[in-house]
Amino acid sequence: MMIASSLAVLYGIAIVSSMGVQSARADYADDCTTPDGDQGQCMPFSSCRTIEERLTEAQKAGQKVPADYASYLQKALCGEFNGVRHFCCPSANIQHNSKVMSLFKDENFDCGNFLSQRVSNGYEVKLSSRPWMALLRYQQFGESRFLCGGAMISERYILTAAHCVHGLQNDLYEIRLGEHRISTEEDCRQQGRKKKCAPPVVNVGIEKHLIHEKYDARHIMHDIALLKLNRSVPFQKHIKPICLPITDELKEKAEQISTYFVTGWGTTENGSSSDVLLQANVPLQPRSACSQAYRRAVPLSQLCVGGGDLQDSCKGDSGGPLQAPAQYLGEYAPKMVEFGIVSQGVVTCGQISLPGLYTNVGEYVQWITDTMASNGL
């Protein structure tokens, strides 16, 4: 019997006793107390090492879950989100979903490959050199417009900001991939006497809008979302995923990089400011700089970046990637990694020279992998 089938039987038991105070109040990743009295978080079973291992052992042995452990799980049940039952998992046992991590670590998963170039602020990037860039298209007041950006992270998922999706699910209907110059049907560059052109752009619909459960628009917290495409988009020369900071080493590196890149068409709630894909350098700032600028504490879930040059932030897309090259899973050549997401309050072109707050992607890899696993790869 498959683990999922065994769990289905177990869940039937657990539902009866899941009306406790903890299960009634818990949300994804909420703090909770395990039946053993340990501090934990409300997580899907596949993200809890001890629970997954125990159930896997039972499955391999062809046994039912022991009655005492079934009772433990009944008490640990803390909620159901996206059709998946969650359990209070000890903090030390929380793990990234193994299926999604296998996808990201597969040797054929060609993420973060980029063409290097010397970049001055506001310069056009080379054709197809940032193949993960995505444009989000909205239908508003009878007009179709690109109002946000994002980054491709798999054949079915785009990573963007929650503020680009929240309250706009009925307007946001399509993703464009493989774009360079918006106004031209075909994107080409002259190389000597030869003209090299990129394949056509791909426009694809959206199956699911997945916003972080704790997104707080007022305080710009947990500003992260996933868009599940309505079909897989095969990787091509001009359409490939960016890498994510999926290891502790990469997560820590976010605080060590001195200069990041923002890439985009300057797409914001007011439209696009550039017809062609641009890139600019933005410096990492201490969180104290943003604390002073925004008069509040800046948590680890956000990065403080930019300031100085008034035009720096104009090149990025709202919801687009804050990126930098880094060593990825032991590979020799650096890969481009998305360390941050352009959040609200960042794209303030020509206004006061303030650093911006970016969503720290490394703090949300758990959420990304859990959400992808719950909604289908």
Curated annotation (Swiss-Prot):
Residues that hold Ca(2+) according to the record: E179, R181, T184, D187
Residues modified by glycosylation: N230, N270
Name under which the protein is recorded: Serine protease grass
Gene Ontology cellular-component terms listed: extracellular region; extracellular space
Signal peptide interval: 1-26
Modification after translation, per record: Proteolytically cleaved by a tryspin-like protease which is likely to activate grass.
Domain comment as written in the entry: The clip domain consists of 35-55 residues which are 'knitted' together usually by 3 conserved disulfide bonds forming a clip-like compact structure.
Name of the gene this protein is made from: grass
Domain Clip: 31-89
Organism expressing this protein natively: Drosophila melanogaster
